[in-house]
Design a protein with these regions (language model features):
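Intrinsically disordered, low-complexity boundary segments flanking structured domains
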Residues: 12, 41-46
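Short amphipathic alpha-helical leader/targeting segments
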Residues: 25-26, 37
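Intrinsically disordered, low-complexity, charged/polar segments
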Residues: 47-106
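Mixed-charge, Lys/Arg-rich low-complexity intrinsically disordered regions
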Residues: 1-13, 18-22, 29-32, 103-106
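Broad hydrophobic/π-residue packing in well-ordered secondary structure
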Residues: 8, 21, 43, 54-55
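Residue-level signal for short segments within beta-strands and strand-turn junctions
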Residues: 27-29, 59
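Short, solvent-exposed secondary-structure boundary/capping segments
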Residues: 32-41
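Charge-rich, low-complexity amphipathic helices
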Residues: 1, 36, 45-47, 79
Length: 106
């Protein structure tokens, strides 16, 4: 297994390459770590490889907030600097600067 360099960091605001949602990264898996049922539910034309980083997001779209699990290949930087309006933001992060949220320093 080779060492992978993450394209994104915890706290980065990102958007999905194919679907209309954005979010902030709060955790990362170094390879696919979800159910096969979830994986097969992704349309084949955008189904990601399993051998890459997957990010946990506090996500939002125009209608709802939710948690998302997205492969690195399907994420782009969101340069809008607009805050994420997810209700769990303040439980995980203590502030925001530009397009990045930061965790509290202990």
């Amino acid at each position: 297994m080779s060492i992978q360099k993450a394209k994104f960091s915890i706290g980065d605001i990102v958007k999905h390459k194919h679907f209309d949602f954005r979010g902030v990264i709060y955790d990362v898996d170094f390879e696919f770590n979800n159910s096969e049922e979830w994986y097969q539910s992704i349309p084949k034309n955008v189904r990601p490889r399993k051998d890459q980083l997957f990010y946990h997001l506090l996500a939002e779209n125009e209608e709802v907030t939710y948690e998302a699990y997205v492969s690195e290949q399907n994420l782009l930087v969101d340069e809008s600097e607009e805050p994420i309006k997810h209700p769990l933001i303040n439980e995980i992060f203590s502030g925001k600067k530009g397009s990045t949220y930061f965790k509290p320093s202990n």
